[in-house]
Amino acid sequence: MQGQWQFDTLYHKVPPFSFTSQTGASFSQKELQGKVFVANFFYTSCQGICKQVSTQLARVHDAFRLQPDVRLVSFTVNPEQDQVPQLKEYSDSFRADPSRWIFLTGPKPQIQALAAQGFKLPVVAAAGDSAELELHKQLMLVDKQKRIRGIYDGTSAKEIDRLITEINVLLSEYETDHGK
């Protein structure tokens, strides 16, 4: 087409969601309108990989603490255990600003569907034939149009450095391209 920019990359879009945050308030994707966000899946009683990933996410949180267009969104994969008090305690342990780093819980089937269809993470059958989200260390960078723009190893300091750089690049693109 003449005179129109054409993109050669197709990004997967994250579907709408609505869950309960660590403050007890309802939180939906609508509240991320105009925001870049980093998503991950975890559970509060996980002592291994989840703590490593959350510690690295705390670096991202601190790097963008004053940036109004960046959020972190952590979805529990164990909503039966991770209710509002547990999410609040967990978020407090990382000194998370609840307006910037949102921890979410909700019905397990909805969280599993969001992980599997929304973020394209594998859901595997666990003992007892119940579908469980296989925990992954990936962090997903999602742009203002809700497109997944990158996947990062949440246990790697080097990958977190790359994530921070790519968030800054994305924000710079918005300032340049969209006259923000």
What are these regions (language model features)?
Residues 127-180:
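Thiol-/selenol-based redox modules, centered on thioredoxin-like
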Residues 18-19, 141:
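Hydrophobic beta-strand positions
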Residues 1-16, 179-180:
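N-terminal targeting signals for export/organelle localization
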Residues 12-14, 36, 134-136:
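Short, small/polar residue-rich loop motifs at catalytic or cofactor-binding pockets
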Residues 27-57, 72-73:
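Short active-site neighborhood of thiol/selenol oxidoreductases, capturing the structured segment around
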Residues 68-83, 99-111:
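Thiol-based oxidoreductase modules, predominantly thioredoxin-like and allied folds used
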Residues 88-136:
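Short, internal strand/loop/helix patches
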